[in-house]
Curated annotation (Swiss-Prot):
Predicted to be exported by the Tat system. The position of the signal peptide cleavage has not been experimentally proven. The lineage of its organism: Bacteria, Pseudomonadati, Pseudomonadota, Alphaproteobacteria, Hyphomicrobiales. Belongs to the MsrP family. GO terms for cellular component: periplasmic space. Residues 1-45 form the signal peptide. This is Protein-methionine-sulfoxide reductase catalytic subunit MsrP. Heterodimer of a catalytic subunit (MsrP) and a heme-binding subunit (MsrQ). Gene3D superfamilies: Oxidoreductase, molybdopterin-binding domain (3.90.420.10). It comes from the Bacteria. Its EC number is 1.8.5.-. Binds 1 Mo-molybdopterin (Mo-MPT) cofactor per subunit. PANTHER family: PROTEIN-METHIONINE-SULFOXIDE REDUCTASE, PROTEIN-METHIONINE-SULFOXIDE REDUCTASE CATALYTIC SUBUNIT MSRP. Coiled coil: none annotated. It comes from Rhizobium etli (strain CIAT 652).
Amino acid sequence: MPSYRPPKIASSEITPRRIYMRRREFLGAAALGAVALYGAGKASAAALPAVESKYKLDEKPTPLKDVTTYNNFYEFGLDKGDPAANSGAFKPLPWTVKVDGMVNKPGTFDLEALMKEFPIEERTYRMRCVEAWSMVIPWDGFPLASLLDKVEPLGSAKYVAFETIVRPEEMPGQKGFFQSLDWPYVEGLRLDEARHPLTLLAVGLYGETLANQNGAPIRLVVPWKYGFKGIKSIVRITLTDQQPKNTWQVTNPQEYGFYANVNPAVDHPRWSQASERRIGEGGFFGASRHPTLPFNGYADEVASLYAGMDLKANF
């Protein structure tokens, strides 16, 4: 597998090192003495004792206010502000994740136990939505590969399927207009994609546990794919030998595919993917636009996964 090399970052995106280190010192102090990583089962954010990893980029992140108020999470509503407005009743704790299917050691795992077993890393990734907007987000989490190693996939396993929780009493979008979707929300990856070092199970961002609107308490982050692959509030992970269909692929197969790799050369049927609107940047005239990079800037690390594939046909 190619060694990791950070995507090229424009100088305008760089955060001064002294400011970055002060933030880390503050978060580290806040995490000292914490009895539980999430606090007493509250939905409010709690500090995470995350450590920097080799994937940590010294980028200027999207402001926290934008990251937590401009979201797609249809379980809570259709508008970008709905998840923040409508997710207050959602209870992210206690939480377990069931891992089953083609594995030697299936099980149902307590999330807080997993967070103690696997070191929490801080990684800053670009996030590119299929709607042609983007953010730069400092995530906290552990590699999906760590959990997969724990359950020991069988040699016959080829894919990994993911499932979101169904709680219509706490997630109003599941009983509103979008109840026509086949809940639960589901997603999938090839096993080699799931095991790639960049693929993260995020449990926090900006050094704190995930807010409900960002996918609390655990979500998938695959930085070279469009954001809809980042399934939120995961309760089940299944290893299989069949390619799983994702929710949007089932709903509209002409517009959404299985792979969803960021590709400026393959337009969405209704808009161009050649550039993106960076949320949190720009002034009076709106957010600035950036050229979209193949695989969202991670081509050196992941392009080999798709060698010989027709990326237009396998969108």
